[in-house]
Amino acid sequence: MANIKSALKRIEIAERNRLQNKSYKSAIKTLMKKTFQSVEAYASDPNPEKLDTINTSMAAAFSKIDKAVKCKVIHKNNAARKKARLAKALQSALPAA
């Protein structure tokens, strides 16, 4: 354990940031799961209300992912990969037109 005052402070800051980052990442995972579940529900029974639910949950997930990049919680390439997975899931559920 550190004895220097500045080192002790850095330990506290690192722990605080770790918990905030963990919260952000958990929220992103939850929103992604919710979006994937909405897409599966739409694929089994397509109707406009379920499509609205997908769009709402996808917008929330994209927003949270972008905010995480802005706060440097996740890397921009990681965010791009997550957003691409969500978009690909939606495209696979939509009928080819």
From Swiss-Prot:
GO terms for molecular function: small ribosomal subunit rRNA binding; structural constituent of ribosome. The keyword Ribonucleoprotein applies. InterPro entries: Ribosomal_bS20 (IPR002583), Ribosomal_bS20_sf (IPR036510). SUPFAM superfamilies: Ribosomal protein S20. HAMAP family: Ribosomal_bS20. PANTHER family: 30S RIBOSOMAL PROTEIN S20, SMALL RIBOSOMAL SUBUNIT PROTEIN BS20C. This is Small ribosomal subunit protein bS20. It comes from Synechocystis sp. (strain ATCC 27184 / PCC 6803 / Kazusa). The gene is rpsT.
